[in-house]
């Protein structure tokens, strides 16, 4: 029997916004136009945020964070020093290297998931795919555990940029990621239609309110209440003073250039602006890591320069503003790539050993957890599991990893599977 889900694989931003553009809620419009009282800096003193930099396709540890220059398959790239003594990374990441006082590397992550979809699911939820249940993504967990505690906050608690993000699963549609498909483009339907004046909007609000209230009273399932809550949140967002964080047209040209004008650079800049306003979770995706051929030219001409500029600027800005103390940053992908270079000058799927980078939010910087052998093949020190990473992220966000949820069908599910514990080396 399949687990009863409140929501399927997610709700598109188009559906989320389009219907609100021609309808509204049964509450006085003035209430939604009232400015928020919370100051962003005060908000951030007591609340944590997480930014996940998602590298879809499976990035190579051998060419980023765990170089093996002595190996026959070490590749073309050379290691360079970072701000952390003894920690070396790729020569094509010099800006990120300067930020390693606040970043650490896990070099011994491993799993059995070498398929893109399964690996993506595993890394986002901490659980291997199971046909009987859709687990909640970490962003939705952060929204549920932390975002709901923010009163009068009109932006979404979970936002995905350049990606659809991971489903909220059994947590319901109110915690499904709000999707920004292109951070360089205006978000469609963020404002009411020009031909809908205030009086017309109020009439629609009353009508929708009657329909929604009757729908909920008829007890048509938990999803009916979620549906109303989503519309409520959306309308408040349309009139929020914090909505400009989702727009980059007013950002100075020099600042745009520091991050890069591409979708990933702009996404990282938007992520910083969102956490400055108190958004709990933002994921920014950079695809193109499935390098089965010509990996060295592809990386040095494309993804690595983009990553270096955007990630370097992001960590630098969070550090200078002090937000790094309350903002967890995680760089990760679905799995790694083979240490051995194939006949097409590429690397293939490799879940046996790979690296992720983590920092901020109370994580100690300049650390290296785990190690692979001289060829980057086998883990020779401190193997780390995906559930351990999930537990570590939860702890950094102030969430108890052992927290247990009960799905609508009564199934107990913990945040971290297999009794996984946080990686203590990153906290002491």
Indicate where each model-derived feature is located.
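Ligand-binding pockets and gating/stacking loops
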Residues: 1-428
